[in-house]
Amino acid sequence: ADPRNPLEECFRETD
């Protein structure tokens, strides 16, 4: 998962 991807960032609960 790419943390720079806004969609993936949505699913990321941890920083």
Swiss-Prot record:
Question: Which principal EC class is assigned to this enzyme?
Answer: oxidoreductase
Instruction: State where it is primarily located.
Output: secreted
The EC number of this protein is 1.4.3.2
| Biological process annotations from GO | apoptotic process; defense response to bacterium; killing of cells of another organism
Tissue expression notes:
Expressed by the venom gland.
- Is Iron among this UniProt entry's keywords? no
What kind of modification does the protein receive after translation?
A: Contains 2 disulfide bonds. N-glycosylated.
Q: Is Transport tagged as a keyword? A: no
Cellular compartments per GO CC = extracellular region
- Catalyzed reactions per annotation: an L-alpha-amino acid + O2 + H2O = a 2-oxocarboxylate + H2O2 + NH4(+)
User: What are the protein's UniProt keywords?
Assistant: Antibiotic, Antimicrobial, Apoptosis, Cytolysis, Disulfide bond, FAD, Flavoprotein, Glycoprotein, Hemolysis, Hemostasis impairing toxin, Oxidoreductase, Secreted, Toxin
Q: List the subcellular locations.
A: Secreted
Q: Which domain of life is it from?
A: Eukaryota
Query: What GO MF annotations does this protein's record show?
Result: L-amino-acid oxidase activity; toxin activity
Q: What does this protein do?
A: Catalyzes an oxidative deamination of predominantly hydrophobic and aromatic L-amino acids, thus producing hydrogen peroxide that may contribute to the diverse toxic effects of this enzyme. Exhibits diverse biological activities, such as hemorrhage, hemolysis, edema, apoptosis of vascular endothelial cells or tumor cell lines, antibacterial and antiparasitic activities, as well as regulation of platelet aggregation. Effects of snake L-amino oxidases on platelets are controversial, since they either induce aggregation or inhibit agonist-induced aggregation.
Subunit text: Homodimer; non-covalently linked.
State the name under which the record lists this protein: L-amino-acid oxidase Bfon20
| Organism taxonomic ancestry | Eukaryota, Metazoa, Chordata, Craniata, Vertebrata
